[in-house]
Amino acid sequence: MKLHLLKSKIHNAIVTSGDLEYEGSITVDSELLKKADMIPNEKVLVVNNNNGERFETYIIKGDHGSRVIQLNGAAARCALPGDEIIIMTFCEIEAEEAPDFKPMVLIVDKNNNPKRRHRIGEEDEQLG
């Protein structure tokens, strides 16, 4: 049996902009993607901490070091610049692997600078 588990998340990111005219997606700084073990085109679940909205989209790679978190297309209606969000990816693994699986958590500050990261159940790695 396969289980659908959290793979990684960027916690408390701040939306920097939105583009309603774009076809859809979320643009994320490529440095943050790498630190969070996420890749372009990966499906994400996004939670808006300001209003409780949840929506799915996919990742577009933003410029390295830009700290961009931009919602595009219809997703731009789900959160406004300045809103705090959580960006999550998921994976399927065999049930017997689940007890040892440890998702990656990247915590960012109010300017989307990486502060620390850890695998759930392990110690933080300080980043900034």
From Swiss-Prot:
Free-text comment on the cofactor: Binds 1 pyruvoyl group covalently per subunit.
Domain of life: Bacteria
Principal location listed in the UniProt entry: cytoplasm
EC numbers for this chain: 4.1.1.11
Keywords, comma-separated and alphabetical: Autocatalytic cleavage, Cytoplasm, Decarboxylase, Lyase, Pantothenate biosynthesis, Pyruvate, Schiff base, Zymogen
Swiss-Prot/TrEMBL catalytic activity: L-aspartate + H(+) = beta-alanine + CO2
One GO cellular component term noted in the UniProt record for this chain: cytosol
Modified sites of kind Pyruvic acid (Ser): S25
Modifications after synthesis and translation: Is synthesized initially as an inactive proenzyme, which is activated by self-cleavage at a specific serine bond to produce a beta-subunit with a hydroxyl group at its C-terminus and an alpha-subunit with a pyruvoyl group at its N-terminus.
Subcellular localization: Cytoplasm
MF (Gene Ontology): aspartate 1-decarboxylase activity
InterPro entries: Asp_de-COase-like_dom_sf, Asp_decarbox
Cytoplasm found in the keyword field: yes
Annotated GO biological process: alanine biosynthetic process; pantothenate biosynthetic process
Binding residues annotated for substrate, in chain numbering: T57, G73, A74, A75
Cofactor needs: pyruvate
Enzymatic class: lyase
Binding partners and assembly: Heterooctamer of four alpha and four beta subunits.
Family recorded in the similarity comment: Belongs to the PanD family.
Protein name: Aspartate 1-decarboxylase
Organism: Chlorobium phaeovibrioides (strain DSM 265 / 1930) (Prosthecochloris vibrioformis (strain DSM 265))
